[in-house]
Amino acid sequence: LTGHGGLEKLEYRTDLPVPTPEKGEVLIKVGASAVNNTDINTRIGWYSKCVIEQTNAGAFDGFQTINDNDASWSGIPVKFPRIQGADCCGEIVAVGEQVSSDRIGERVLVRTLQQSVMTEAEYSCITYGSECDGGFAQYTKVLATEAFPIRSSLNDAELASFPCAYSTAENMIDRANVKPNDTVLITGASGGVGSAAVQLVKRRHAEVIAICSENKMEQLIALGADKVIPRGRNLLDFLGQDSVDVVIDLVAGKQWPELPDLLRKGGSYTVAGAIAGPIVELDVRTLYLKDLSFLGCTYQPRSVFENLIRYIERSELHPLVAKQYSLKEIKSAQQDFMAKKFVGKLILLPPQ
Protein backbone atom coordinates (compact mmCIF):
# COMPACT_ATOMS: atom_id res chain seq x y z
CA LEU A 1 0.00 0.00 0.00
CA THR A 2 1.66 3.22 -1.18
CA GLY A 3 -0.75 5.72 0.38
CA HIS A 4 -4.38 6.44 1.22
CA GLY A 5 -6.71 6.35 -1.76
CA GLY A 6 -8.28 4.11 -4.38
CA LEU A 7 -7.26 0.73 -5.72
CA GLU A 8 -4.40 2.37 -7.61
CA LYS A 9 -2.59 2.68 -4.26
CA LEU A 10 -2.11 -1.11 -4.19
CA GLU A 11 1.10 -2.31 -5.85
CA TYR A 12 2.20 -5.92 -6.34
CA ARG A 13 5.99 -6.03 -6.02
CA THR A 14 8.55 -8.82 -6.40
CA ASP A 15 11.71 -6.91 -5.46
CA LEU A 16 11.36 -6.61 -1.68
CA PRO A 17 13.93 -8.35 0.56
CA VAL A 18 12.91 -11.13 2.94
CA PRO A 19 12.60 -9.57 6.43
CA THR A 20 15.25 -10.41 9.02
CA PRO A 21 13.85 -11.33 12.44
CA GLU A 22 15.26 -9.14 15.21
CA LYS A 23 15.45 -9.81 18.95
CA GLY A 24 12.30 -11.54 20.14
CA GLU A 25 10.91 -11.97 16.63
CA VAL A 26 10.15 -14.87 14.30
CA LEU A 27 10.12 -15.01 10.50
CA ILE A 28 7.04 -16.69 9.03
CA LYS A 29 6.61 -18.09 5.54
CA VAL A 30 3.03 -17.09 4.78
CA GLY A 31 0.73 -19.88 3.62
CA ALA A 32 -2.40 -17.75 3.30
CA SER A 33 -3.98 -14.46 4.32
CA ALA A 34 -7.49 -13.04 3.98
CA VAL A 35 -9.24 -9.80 3.03
CA ASN A 36 -10.95 -7.83 5.80
CA ASN A 37 -12.86 -4.57 6.10
CA THR A 38 -9.88 -3.05 7.87
CA ASP A 39 -7.78 -3.46 4.70
CA ILE A 40 -10.26 -1.28 2.81
CA ASN A 41 -10.70 1.19 5.67
CA THR A 42 -6.96 1.66 6.10
CA ARG A 43 -6.37 2.04 2.37
CA ILE A 44 -9.00 4.75 1.94
CA GLY A 45 -8.28 6.49 5.26
CA TRP A 46 -11.79 5.82 6.56
CA TYR A 47 -10.64 5.85 10.20
CA SER A 48 -9.95 9.59 9.91
CA LYS A 49 -12.54 11.53 11.89
CA CYS A 50 -13.09 13.88 8.95
CA VAL A 51 -14.66 10.98 7.01
CA ILE A 52 -18.35 10.56 7.83
CA GLU A 53 -19.50 8.46 4.85
CA GLN A 54 -19.97 4.70 4.72
CA THR A 55 -16.98 2.60 3.67
CA ASN A 56 -18.19 1.85 0.13
CA ALA A 57 -18.48 5.57 -0.66
CA GLY A 58 -14.71 5.69 -1.04
CA ALA A 59 -13.82 2.02 -1.40
CA PHE A 60 -12.92 2.13 -5.10
CA ASP A 61 -11.52 5.63 -5.61
CA GLY A 62 -10.82 6.85 -2.06
CA PHE A 63 -12.21 9.98 -0.40
CA GLN A 64 -11.53 13.49 -1.62
CA THR A 65 -10.66 14.71 1.87
CA ILE A 66 -9.02 12.81 4.72
CA ASN A 67 -6.57 13.66 7.48
CA ASP A 68 -3.50 11.42 7.20
CA ASN A 69 -2.64 12.11 10.85
CA ASP A 70 -5.53 10.06 12.29
CA ALA A 71 -6.33 7.61 9.48
CA SER A 72 -5.40 4.39 11.30
CA TRP A 73 -6.81 2.17 14.05
CA SER A 74 -4.58 3.77 16.67
CA GLY A 75 -5.11 7.33 15.46
CA ILE A 76 -1.51 7.79 14.34
CA PRO A 77 -0.26 8.19 10.76
CA VAL A 78 0.27 5.01 8.72
CA LYS A 79 3.85 4.70 7.48
CA PHE A 80 4.00 4.01 3.74
CA PRO A 81 4.74 1.83 1.93
CA ARG A 82 2.87 -0.63 4.14
CA ILE A 83 2.31 -4.35 3.59
CA GLN A 84 -1.30 -4.92 4.59
CA GLY A 85 -3.01 -8.15 5.65
CA ALA A 86 -4.59 -8.60 9.09
CA ASP A 87 -4.67 -12.41 8.79
CA CYS A 88 -1.78 -14.84 8.52
CA CYS A 89 -1.39 -18.60 8.66
CA GLY A 90 2.10 -19.87 8.01
CA GLU A 91 5.23 -21.63 9.23
CA ILE A 92 8.10 -20.23 11.30
CA VAL A 93 11.28 -20.52 9.21
CA ALA A 94 13.74 -18.43 11.25
CA VAL A 95 14.02 -16.84 14.69
CA GLY A 96 15.76 -13.81 16.14
CA GLU A 97 17.78 -13.52 19.33
CA GLN A 98 16.17 -14.76 22.55
CA VAL A 99 13.74 -17.01 20.66
CA SER A 100 14.23 -20.77 20.88
CA SER A 101 15.21 -22.44 17.62
CA ASP A 102 12.75 -25.17 18.61
CA ARG A 103 10.05 -22.90 17.20
CA ILE A 104 11.36 -23.30 13.65
CA GLY A 105 8.88 -25.46 11.75
CA GLU A 106 5.89 -24.48 13.90
CA ARG A 107 2.63 -23.86 12.09
CA VAL A 108 1.19 -20.63 13.49
CA LEU A 109 -1.60 -18.09 13.36
CA VAL A 110 -0.68 -14.45 13.92
CA ARG A 111 -2.78 -12.40 16.34
CA THR A 112 -4.32 -9.38 14.63
CA LEU A 113 -4.65 -6.99 17.58
CA GLN A 114 -1.15 -7.10 19.01
CA GLN A 115 -0.36 -5.78 22.46
CA SER A 116 3.19 -6.85 23.23
CA VAL A 117 4.57 -4.85 20.28
CA MET A 118 4.06 -1.65 22.23
CA THR A 119 3.38 -2.16 25.91
CA GLU A 120 1.50 -4.40 28.30
CA ALA A 121 -0.71 -1.45 29.27
CA GLU A 122 -4.40 -2.33 29.00
CA TYR A 123 -6.18 -1.04 25.88
CA SER A 124 -2.86 -0.29 24.16
CA CYS A 125 -2.45 -2.27 20.94
CA ILE A 126 -1.55 -2.07 17.26
CA THR A 127 -3.14 -3.77 14.27
CA TYR A 128 -1.16 -6.27 12.23
CA GLY A 129 -1.15 -5.03 8.64
CA SER A 130 -1.91 -1.43 9.61
CA GLU A 131 0.55 -0.07 12.17
CA CYS A 132 3.06 -2.76 11.19
CA ASP A 133 3.58 -4.88 8.06
CA GLY A 134 1.11 -7.74 7.70
CA GLY A 135 0.38 -10.96 5.87
CA PHE A 136 -0.02 -9.89 2.22
CA ALA A 137 3.47 -11.19 1.42
CA GLN A 138 5.52 -14.36 1.06
CA TYR A 139 7.23 -13.68 4.38
CA THR A 140 6.34 -11.68 7.47
CA LYS A 141 8.02 -11.10 10.81
CA VAL A 142 6.30 -10.63 14.16
CA LEU A 143 7.15 -10.87 17.82
CA ALA A 144 7.35 -14.51 18.85
CA THR A 145 4.65 -13.85 21.46
CA GLU A 146 2.21 -12.90 18.68
CA ALA A 147 2.67 -16.13 16.67
CA PHE A 148 0.42 -18.81 18.17
CA PRO A 149 1.08 -22.50 17.44
CA ILE A 150 -1.91 -24.23 15.86
CA ARG A 151 -2.54 -27.97 15.52
CA SER A 152 -5.31 -28.59 13.03
CA SER A 153 -6.14 -30.67 9.97
CA LEU A 154 -7.53 -27.55 8.25
CA ASN A 155 -5.51 -26.18 5.34
CA ASP A 156 -3.76 -22.80 5.38
CA ALA A 157 -6.56 -21.02 3.51
CA GLU A 158 -9.15 -22.28 5.99
CA LEU A 159 -7.04 -21.32 8.99
CA ALA A 160 -6.31 -17.88 7.55
CA SER A 161 -10.04 -17.16 7.62
CA PHE A 162 -10.05 -17.10 11.43
CA PRO A 163 -7.70 -14.59 13.12
CA CYS A 164 -9.12 -11.11 12.45
CA ALA A 165 -12.83 -11.84 12.03
CA TYR A 166 -13.25 -14.52 14.68
CA SER A 167 -11.16 -12.78 17.34
CA THR A 168 -13.17 -9.60 16.76
CA ALA A 169 -16.43 -11.50 17.15
CA GLU A 170 -15.27 -13.49 20.17
CA ASN A 171 -14.10 -10.32 21.89
CA MET A 172 -17.49 -8.66 21.36
CA ILE A 173 -19.32 -11.71 22.67
CA ASP A 174 -17.01 -11.94 25.66
CA ARG A 175 -17.33 -8.24 26.48
CA ALA A 176 -21.13 -8.54 26.34
CA ASN A 177 -20.98 -11.62 28.59
CA VAL A 178 -23.31 -13.61 26.34
CA LYS A 179 -24.90 -16.44 28.32
CA PRO A 180 -26.92 -19.54 27.41
CA ASN A 181 -30.47 -18.65 26.36
CA ASP A 182 -29.64 -14.98 25.71
CA THR A 183 -31.11 -13.52 22.54
CA VAL A 184 -28.41 -11.90 20.40
CA LEU A 185 -29.01 -9.69 17.35
CA ILE A 186 -26.14 -9.61 14.81
CA THR A 187 -26.03 -6.93 12.10
CA GLY A 188 -24.01 -7.55 8.95
CA ALA A 189 -24.28 -11.25 9.73
CA SER A 190 -23.09 -12.54 6.36
CA GLY A 191 -19.70 -10.78 6.50
CA GLY A 192 -16.51 -12.17 7.99
CA VAL A 193 -17.08 -10.94 11.55
CA GLY A 194 -20.85 -11.40 11.40
CA SER A 195 -20.73 -15.01 10.22
CA ALA A 196 -18.06 -15.69 12.83
CA ALA A 197 -20.34 -14.20 15.49
CA VAL A 198 -23.19 -16.50 14.44
CA GLN A 199 -21.02 -19.56 15.12
CA LEU A 200 -19.48 -18.20 18.30
CA VAL A 201 -22.81 -17.13 19.81
CA LYS A 202 -24.33 -20.55 19.04
CA ARG A 203 -21.28 -22.11 20.68
CA ARG A 204 -22.45 -20.43 23.90
CA HIS A 205 -25.96 -21.87 23.43
CA ALA A 206 -27.63 -18.49 22.90
CA GLU A 207 -30.29 -17.57 20.33
CA VAL A 208 -29.09 -15.81 17.17
CA ILE A 209 -31.13 -13.31 15.18
CA ALA A 210 -29.16 -12.41 12.05
CA ILE A 211 -29.60 -9.47 9.68
CA CYS A 212 -28.38 -9.90 6.09
CA SER A 213 -29.45 -9.40 2.48
CA GLU A 214 -32.27 -11.63 1.26
CA ASN A 215 -30.08 -13.68 -1.08
CA LYS A 216 -27.91 -14.81 1.86
CA MET A 217 -30.63 -15.76 4.33
CA GLU A 218 -30.55 -19.51 3.64
CA GLN A 219 -26.79 -19.62 4.16
CA LEU A 220 -27.14 -17.93 7.55
CA ILE A 221 -29.81 -20.41 8.62
CA ALA A 222 -27.53 -23.26 7.54
CA LEU A 223 -24.77 -21.68 9.62
CA GLY A 224 -26.94 -21.86 12.72
CA ALA A 225 -28.95 -18.63 12.93
CA ASP A 226 -32.31 -19.19 14.65
CA LYS A 227 -33.99 -16.31 12.83
CA VAL A 228 -32.92 -14.20 9.85
CA ILE A 229 -34.26 -10.75 8.97
CA PRO A 230 -33.76 -9.19 5.52
CA ARG A 231 -31.56 -6.11 5.65
CA GLY A 232 -33.47 -2.82 5.54
CA ARG A 233 -36.67 -4.07 7.17
CA ASN A 234 -38.10 -2.30 10.22
CA LEU A 235 -36.60 -4.21 13.13
CA LEU A 236 -39.13 -2.99 15.68
CA ASP A 237 -41.95 -4.33 13.50
CA PHE A 238 -40.21 -7.71 13.22
CA LEU A 239 -39.06 -8.10 16.81
CA GLY A 240 -40.77 -5.52 19.02
CA GLN A 241 -39.24 -3.34 21.70
CA ASP A 242 -37.21 -4.90 24.51
CA SER A 243 -36.77 -8.15 22.58
CA VAL A 244 -33.02 -8.87 22.66
CA ASP A 245 -30.35 -9.08 25.35
CA VAL A 246 -27.30 -8.23 23.23
CA VAL A 247 -26.68 -6.39 19.95
CA ILE A 248 -23.50 -7.18 18.01
CA ASP A 249 -23.26 -4.28 15.57
CA LEU A 250 -20.90 -4.15 12.61
CA VAL A 251 -22.91 -1.78 10.44
CA ALA A 252 -24.26 1.34 12.28
CA GLY A 253 -25.73 3.70 9.65
CA LYS A 254 -29.31 4.92 9.22
CA GLN A 255 -30.99 1.97 10.95
CA TRP A 256 -28.92 2.39 14.12
CA PRO A 257 -31.55 4.28 16.20
CA GLU A 258 -33.71 1.14 16.26
CA LEU A 259 -31.03 -0.93 18.00
CA PRO A 260 -31.18 0.58 21.52
CA ASP A 261 -34.98 0.29 21.46
CA LEU A 262 -34.67 -3.44 20.76
CA LEU A 263 -32.54 -4.04 23.85
CA ARG A 264 -34.10 -5.23 27.08
CA LYS A 265 -33.35 -3.38 30.31
CA GLY A 266 -29.77 -4.06 31.33
CA GLY A 267 -28.89 -5.17 27.80
CA SER A 268 -25.56 -4.69 26.05
CA TYR A 269 -24.73 -3.02 22.74
CA THR A 270 -21.33 -3.93 21.31
CA VAL A 271 -19.80 -2.36 18.21
CA ALA A 272 -16.69 -3.06 16.12
CA GLY A 273 -17.64 -1.64 12.74
CA ALA A 274 -19.69 1.00 10.96
CA ILE A 275 -19.64 0.12 7.27
CA ALA A 276 -23.01 1.83 6.68
CA GLY A 277 -21.79 5.08 8.24
CA PRO A 278 -20.17 6.08 11.56
CA ILE A 279 -22.42 9.02 12.52
CA VAL A 280 -25.64 8.03 14.33
CA GLU A 281 -28.25 9.66 16.58
CA LEU A 282 -28.91 8.50 20.14
CA ASP A 283 -31.62 9.53 22.56
CA VAL A 284 -29.55 9.27 25.74
CA ARG A 285 -32.71 8.73 27.77
CA THR A 286 -32.95 5.27 26.23
CA LEU A 287 -29.40 4.60 27.36
CA TYR A 288 -29.83 5.54 31.01
CA LEU A 289 -33.48 4.73 31.62
CA LYS A 290 -32.95 1.17 30.37
CA ASP A 291 -29.57 0.80 32.13
CA LEU A 292 -27.90 -0.22 28.88
CA SER A 293 -24.20 -0.94 28.47
CA PHE A 294 -22.50 0.43 25.35
CA LEU A 295 -19.21 -1.32 24.54
CA GLY A 296 -16.75 -0.27 21.87
CA CYS A 297 -14.60 -3.29 21.02
CA THR A 298 -11.11 -2.97 19.57
CA TYR A 299 -8.53 -4.00 22.18
CA GLN A 300 -8.50 -7.73 22.89
CA PRO A 301 -6.91 -9.40 25.91
CA ARG A 302 -4.58 -12.26 25.03
CA SER A 303 -7.12 -14.76 26.35
CA VAL A 304 -9.43 -14.05 23.39
CA PHE A 305 -6.95 -15.40 20.85
CA GLU A 306 -5.88 -18.24 23.13
CA ASN A 307 -9.51 -19.34 23.39
CA LEU A 308 -9.94 -19.05 19.62
CA ILE A 309 -6.98 -21.37 19.06
CA ARG A 310 -8.57 -23.93 21.39
CA TYR A 311 -11.94 -23.73 19.62
CA ILE A 312 -10.24 -24.36 16.26
CA GLU A 313 -8.17 -27.26 17.56
CA ARG A 314 -11.31 -28.86 19.02
CA SER A 315 -13.10 -28.43 15.64
CA GLU A 316 -15.81 -26.28 17.23
CA LEU A 317 -15.75 -23.73 14.40
CA HIS A 318 -16.40 -24.13 10.69
CA PRO A 319 -14.19 -22.09 8.31
CA LEU A 320 -16.09 -20.17 5.65
CA VAL A 321 -13.87 -19.75 2.60
CA ALA A 322 -15.87 -18.17 -0.21
CA LYS A 323 -13.10 -17.79 -2.81
CA GLN A 324 -9.31 -17.93 -3.19
CA TYR A 325 -7.01 -15.61 -5.16
CA SER A 326 -3.31 -15.41 -5.86
CA LEU A 327 -1.62 -12.53 -4.04
CA LYS A 328 -1.09 -10.63 -7.29
CA GLU A 329 -4.89 -10.59 -7.73
CA ILE A 330 -5.30 -8.41 -4.63
CA LYS A 331 -7.16 -5.67 -6.50
CA SER A 332 -9.70 -8.16 -7.85
CA ALA A 333 -10.08 -9.66 -4.38
CA GLN A 334 -10.80 -6.25 -2.86
CA GLN A 335 -13.26 -5.41 -5.65
CA ASP A 336 -15.13 -8.66 -5.00
CA PHE A 337 -14.97 -8.02 -1.26
CA MET A 338 -16.62 -4.63 -1.70
CA ALA A 339 -19.35 -6.13 -3.89
CA LYS A 340 -20.50 -8.20 -0.87
CA LYS A 341 -21.90 -11.06 -2.97
CA PHE A 342 -20.48 -13.82 -0.77
CA VAL A 343 -20.70 -15.25 2.76
CA GLY A 344 -17.48 -15.74 4.71
CA LYS A 345 -13.91 -14.87 3.71
CA LEU A 346 -11.88 -14.16 0.56
CA ILE A 347 -8.40 -15.70 0.77
CA LEU A 348 -5.11 -14.48 -0.73
CA LEU A 349 -2.40 -17.06 -1.47
CA PRO A 350 1.22 -15.87 -1.90
CA PRO A 351 3.63 -17.64 -4.27
CA GLN A 352 5.08 -20.79 -2.67
Predicted features and spans:
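Rossmann-fold dehydrogenase core element
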Residues: G267-A272, E281-V321
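NAD(P)H dinucleotide-binding glycine-rich loop of Rossmann-like/cofactor-binding domains
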Residues: F63-I83, V110-G188
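Mid-domain Rossmann-like dinucleotide-binding core that forms the NAD(H)/NADP(H) cofactor-binding site
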Residues: R107, L154-R233
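Glycine-rich cofactor phosphate-binding loops and adjacent beta1-alpha1 units
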Residues: I209-C212, E218-D291
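C-terminal hydrophobic helical "lid"/dimerization subdomain
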Residues: N171, R302-Q352
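Conserved "cap/hinge" positions at secondary-structure junctions
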Residues: G96, T112-Q114, G188, C212, ...
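Glycine-rich beta-strand-centered segment in the early N-terminal region that forms part
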Residues: P17-S33, S48-Q114
